[in-house]
Amino acid sequence: MRITHLAASNWRNFKNVEFDVGERLFVVGPNAAGKSNLLDVFRFLADIAGPGGGLASAVDRRGGLKKVRSLFSRNNAKGRLAVDVTLQDGDDSWRYRLSVKGEGKGPNRPVVDEELVVKNGEELLKRPDDRDRNDEILLTQTHLEQIASNQSFRSIADYFDQVQSRPPDHPRPLARRHRRRRPLRERFHRPDERDRAPTS
């Protein structure tokens, strides 16, 4: 399985972004152009689907909905943060769409505005459904993160969970940060005859 197309709205510094994903993808641009933010879309889905993760955790570890949602969101897509991915698994084509909004009351938790799963043109999941409307707290969790609810599309959850990348809030490896640096003289000094040990 692999992602073949991605579209997102109100994601970090992007009002709207959409592109195909080939066998190999290069993301280039100047500093602060949003390259890391773009790649974080994939980590975001992994954090939702992974063990001990979930929607609330994925949003919280990025500083909350205000930090994740674009500054353009007030006048774009009703302020919803949306991620829409198309995936290919052999002969099977999948689509997963997640739209998130603020609860609008109390702690303003992130809640599911829309969750959609389509396989080969057949709609397997569309939320909110009747259960969600009768118990709105269910919308604080995606079905992607729930083993009891994602049986029909667990292969997507397993795929997202395999995304391997250093999380945005994870420090650089200690080996890189604290590796021993040689004294300046050792790094730039070329030994001459006086530095060499005498030979017999």
Region roles according to the model:
Residues 40-105:
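Conserved P-loop NTP-binding catalytic core
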Residues 90-200:
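Electropositive, glycine-dotted interaction segments
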